[in-house]
Every structure is written in C-alpha cells, then in structure tokens.
From Swiss-Prot:
Annotated substrate binding sites: R20, H132, T351
PANTHER family to which the protein is assigned, alphabetical: 8-AMINO-7-OXONONANOATE SYNTHASE, CLASS II AMINOTRANSFERASE/8-AMINO-7-OXONONANOATE SYNTHASE
Pfam families: Aminotran_1_2
UniProt GO BP: biotin biosynthetic process
Signal peptide stretch: none
Family, per entry: Belongs to the class-II pyridoxal-phosphate-dependent aminotransferase family. BioF subfamily.
Recorded GO MF terms: 8-amino-7-oxononanoate synthase activity; pyridoxal phosphate binding
Record's protein name: 8-amino-7-oxononanoate synthase
Keywords carried by this UniProt record: Biotin biosynthesis, Pyridoxal phosphate, Transferase
Reaction equations catalysed: 6-carboxyhexanoyl-[ACP] + L-alanine + H(+) = (8S)-8-amino-7-oxononanoate + holo-[ACP] + CO2
Pathway(s) of this molecule: Cofactor biosynthesis; biotin biosynthesis
Amino acid sequence: MLLDRLKADLAELDTRALRRTRRSLATPCAPHARVDGRDMLAFCSNDYLGLAANPALTRALQTGAVHWGAGCGASHLVSGHYAVHDELEARLAAFVDCERALYFSTGYMANTGTIPALVGRGDAIFADRLNHASLVDGALLSRAELHRYAHGDPAALERALAASSARRKLIVTDAVFSMDGDVAPLATLLELAERFDAWLMVDDAHGFGVLGPGGRGAVAEAGLASWRLIYVGTLGKAAGVSGAFVAGHADVVEWLMQKARTYIFTTGAPPALAETLLASLELIERGDERREHLVGLVALLRRELTLARWQLLPSRTPIQPVLIGDNAEALAVARALWDEGLWVPAIRPPTVPHGTARLRISLTAAHCADDVRRLAQALNRLEAQR
C-alpha cells in the first residue's frame, strides 16, 4: 500500500539520521529565546542585523496594518498592487543601483519564477553546483539544459560556456553560499557572461544588508554594474521582514512582471509588509555600526575556536560552518550543545553533499562577545571529549 511505503520511507530517514524536526519559539526572533519550553542561546537565525524584532519595524508594521489593512485582496496584476508596493520597489532599485525592481512574496518564488521567465527549451543554464535549492528548482522548471559546474570554479564554467551552442545562456549563482559562507567570484563570472553573451543572475540572499557599502550587497562590494546582471535580494534575512526582490535593467524587470508565474499567479504580499520594509531599508542604510559589530564577532569566533578534527570552513560572512562529516555525529554534537542551552543546527544531506554534515553557526549583530565565547568554549570542549 502507498501508506505503508511512505511509512517505510520515513523509517529510512530515521535510519540514516536524516529526519528533520521543528522547534517552537515562544519569544520574538533574538539570540536569547524561549524554545520548546527552554531558555536557549540561538545561533540559527539569518536575522543578520538583528532587525526582526526591532521596535522601529514593529511600529511600521502596526502603522501599515492600520492604514492598509491585513491583506491586499488580489494578485498584483489584478487589484492587489498598492502605492506602498510601488514606493518599496523604487527604493529597492535605487538602493542596489538598478533601473527597476520587482517585489516577490518570498525568495523561493523570486528564483523559481525568474529563471523560467528568462530561459526555456533550447536555452542553457550554467549553475554553481552548490547553489540554493530554489535556484536548482527554478532551473529544472525552465526545461532549459542545465550544466552544473564545480563549486567556485570559473575555469569549469568557461569550458561549459565555450562548448554550448544554446540560443540563450544564463549563469546562475549564489553570491554568498548558504551552507559554506564563501562568496562567489562575481567579477570573473560577469566577465564570462560578457564574453559568451550570457545573463548573470546573482542570488544575494545572504549578502544583501550585510556586505558592500551601506549593506548594498555582494555585487556592490565587487563594484559591478551591467545590464546583464539580474540581482535577487532577500528581505527576510538581514532586512528582518519577509519577501524578496529582483532588480536589473528596466526591460528585464518588465518582462518578469509579464512572465514570472510566481509573481502573476499568487495573491500579493500584504502592503503592511512593504511599509515595514521601507523602515528596514532606512536601518540597513544607517547600519554600519551593526555591520562592524558583526565583522568583529566573526573574527572573535574564528580566533576562539581551536578545533583539531572538525573543520571550521573558510568564511568571512556571518555563516560559519563547522564541518563534522558524519550525519549521526553532527546530530549528536547539536544535541549536546542543546543540552547546554546552545541552539546550533546540524545540516545534513540533501542540503549539503554526502559526507559533509556540519554545524551551521549563524552570527547576528544582536549577539555579544560573551555569547560567541560561550559557544566557542563549548565546541572546543565537545570536540576534545569525542
């Protein structure tokens, strides 16, 4: 029976230490949280600037709800597009120095809608092997040829581009890779896009608000500008709210508005969220002190960790992965940390390649130095004991 097979598949997940579970928070997003009835110090959140519970954002959300109501009532192309959505898109485009931006309800929807709108059968996509699942799914939905090149290897990408006779080419990459914390070689990728007449789509989910001048992201940090660039920024991470946007040349964004199915065939995001995001953008622009504090915490963690067998992967971003390897051991270490009041997620396949299970430490500007030292001391001790 189908249900028996499903139960067997679930049991197999347990056997391989791959079943995922949820934990329930009873407090707002912050490092010190009440989780499943316990007081915990959390290193899980991608609220990198500590804005999710910022009073200015909660006030903006309240004001927006009073003015605009709870929902928008329709899709953007029917009657669900409000003046505050226009204002947000204009502000986002200006912030990342692009001609125009389009606001999506989620980052997943932005990626899975944008890629199939740009390429299809007869076209080719060239994707870093460690791209986020939403980029992979968008590529598969497009039905274009999918070439996955070795992670961070522009030479492999160049060979694939040179061998392709596709009518349209799209290079797709994370800016900051979510499970490793490293940054893509964006300048080299843009040079290849120009040489081989390709689009370059950059998903800056973990760079927007954190990297670059004024938090304008990894593309701004690299000093890049081109009509070929299609920039995706996430608004539920450093921005502390929800949603995502795609920015670029005005004609590209117009095309996405006409063709991106995840934009067209869904009710628009509540205008109160757009109101909140306008307040978030102001805090991001003025957030140099937060970003400097975050850089200091990253440096402190890397100094304090003295691991011998486990590997702290090279990363200058708030994502600091500790590679353990074995699924069961990674889970056991995460449980041991949990027992000490430290919440650090164990990341396992299929999110990461087999044999690379890890702890994914996420630092935020809301952490303090003592928080980081406490975590480092616990990890050093646990590794020595195992």
